[in-house]
From Swiss-Prot:
Keywords: Acyltransferase, Disease variant, Endoplasmic reticulum, Lipoprotein, Membrane, Palmitate, Transferase, Transmembrane, Transmembrane helix, Wnt signaling pathway. The lineage of its organism: Eukaryota, Metazoa, Chordata, Craniata, Vertebrata. The gene is PORCN. Residues 39-66, 117-152, 220-252, 359-396 are extracellular. This is Protein-serine O-palmitoleoyltransferase porcupine. It comes from Homo sapiens. It is linked to Focal dermal hypoplasia: A rare congenital ectomesodermal disorder characterized by a combination of skin defects, skeletal abnormalities, and ocular anomalies. Affected individuals have patchy dermal hypoplasia, often in a distribution pattern following the Blaschko lines, and areas of subcutaneous fat herniation or deposition of fat into the dermis. In addition, sparse and brittle hair, hypoplastic nails and papillomas have been described. Skeletal abnormalities usually comprise syndactyly, ectrodactyly, and brachydactyly, and in some cases osteopathia striata has been seen.
Length: 461
């Protein structure tokens, strides 16, 4: 890259990565977008409710087949199993628990090679959405937030809602019922779809091109003196951390791509709005990239990574597990997240590490906030908080320190998602040896720092 002139570099970047990536992305998703729009227009015709539910089931089935062909049978089997359990337990007050156990057994059987690993992992996104919707519906029925057990066509319409079945996000049963009512089309709705789709393509391009083009072009040139340090060990360490950060950034933007695309498909199909006095506010937000790339804390990162999933985990997993104690509830929540995302050693290691990092950060900052009477909690304080020190230089410095520490943790954890690993290895999941090797290269730094923070937390108690 260093031998290219600036004009040649950007020309190669445009022709070799940006345009082909954007074109391939649109080729993959245009049919799904068309189906979402068709369903949205169909629901405006004032059809009977059962036909609206049936149409979204048909659209969801077609979308699944388009992306996964006959492998979609595993998603269909899960949805049928969920409704069978819901029907059998329709008079119980523990429907959420029964559905959770059923889904847990089903997913574990799949992870234990009931199905080919690559095939199973290809389906995990759709399986995750079906599982999350079924569990949330079960608990909402138990809590009385949903009055009666939905009919089969309502249940399947919710699970296979065309705007969410492939890329997500999770939406509640109430949001689904609002979507199929066929709310009026508007400029705000179209603007939201266009904005989310444009951001999705931008993130796809950055995720794909940051590794082979952008990162090697900018970082080595700007950091040339740093990388040519006379001390070979220091140079090697810096290169490894830069590579880790490169992998992390590429992985982050691939997640933002899915997040913004799911915003576009869900909104296009008519979901993701709040009702204001005189209009609908199309305000569905899945990810907040700035809160991840420039974080206040790791807690903020975890929340902003996927807002609907964060809400689901908090409302249907963490709150139900709180009777086990706070730390145990945190572990159960991250274990549930690992299972939903598909068990692989590297993913389980990342999520387990996140559980410890976020817990230690939370309790440490809570204690510091109490001792210093300062706004240094993991989450921003409300305007009427009782802390004496809110915006002082020391408070800002401490928050910046924890923000920098969060970026450090993100680079360390993201090093496992190597941009140079082939697709087959990525689909099968990285093994224990790969995970240990990657983190050994970085001297297990994040884990040692977390342990040090925990020791400090205990000492200042």
């Amino acid at each position: 890259m260093a031998t290219f002139s600036r004009q040649e570099f950007f020309q190669q970047l445009l022709q070799g990565c940006l345009l082909p990536t954007a074109q391939q992305g649109l080729d993959q998703i245009w049919l799904l977008l068309a189906i979402c729009l068709a369903c949205r227009l169909l629901w405006r015709l004032g059809l009977p409710s059962y036909l609206k539910h049936a149409s979204t089931v048909a659209g969801g089935f077609f979308s699944l087949y388009h992306f996964f062909q006959l492998h979609m049978v595993w998603v269909v089997l899960l949805s049928l199993l969920c409704y069978l359990v819901l029907f059998l337990c329709r008079h119980s007050s523990h429907r959420g628990v029964f559905l959770s156990v059923t889904i847990l057994i089903y997913l574990l059987m799949g992870e234990m090679h009931m199905v080919d690993t690559v095939t199973w992992h290809k389906m995990r996104g759709a399986q995750m959405i079906v599982a999350m919707k079924a569990v949330s519906l079960g608990f909402d029925l138990d809590r009385g937030e949903v009055g009666t057990v939905p009919s089969p066509v309502e249940f399947m319409g919710y699970l296979y809602f065309v705007g969410t079945i492939v890329f997500g996000p999770w939406i509640s049963f109430h949001s689904y019922l609002q979507a199929v009512q066929g709310r009026p089309l508007s400029c705000r709705w179209l603007q939201k779809v266009a904005r989310s789709l444009a951001l999705a393509l931008l993130c796809l391009v950055l995720s794909t091109c940051v590794g082979p083009y952008l990162f090697p072009y900018f970082i080595p040139l700007n950091g040339d003196r740093l990388l040519r340090n006379k001390k070979r060990k220091a140079r090697g360490t810096m290169v490894r951390w830069l590579r880790a950060y490169e992998s992390a950034v590429s992985f982050h933007f691939s997640n933002y791509f899915v997040g913004f695309l799911s915003e576009a498909t869900a909104t296009l199909a008519g979901a993701g709005f709040t009702e204001e006095k005189d209009h609908l506010e199309w305000d569905l937000t899945v990810s907040k990239p700035l809160n991840v790339e420039l974080p206040r804390s790791m807690v903020e990162v975890v929340t902003s990574w996927n807002l609907p999933m964060s809400y689901w985990l908090n409302n249907y997993v963490f709150k139900n597990a709180l009777r086990l104690g706070t730390f145990s509830a945190v572990l159960v929540t991250y274990a549930a997240s690992a299972l939903l995302h598909g068990f692989s050693f590297h993913l389980a290691a990342v999520l387990l590490s996140l559980a410890f990092i976020t817990y230690v950060e939370h309790v440490l900052r809570k204690r510091l906030a109490r001792i210093l009477s300062a706004c240094v909690l993991s989450k921003r304080c409300p305007p009427d908080c009782s802390h004496q020190h809110r915006l002082g230089l020391g408070v800002r410095a401490l928050n910046l320190l924890f923000g920098a520490l969060a970026i450090f943790h993100l680079a360390y954890l993201g090093s496992l998602f190597d941009v140079d690993v082939d697709d087959t290895t990525e689909e099968q999941g990285y093994g224990m040896a790969y995970t240990v090797h990657k983190w050994s290269e970085l001297s297990w730094a994040s884990h040692w720092v977390t342990f040090g923070c925990w020791i400090f937390y205990r000492l200042i108690g």
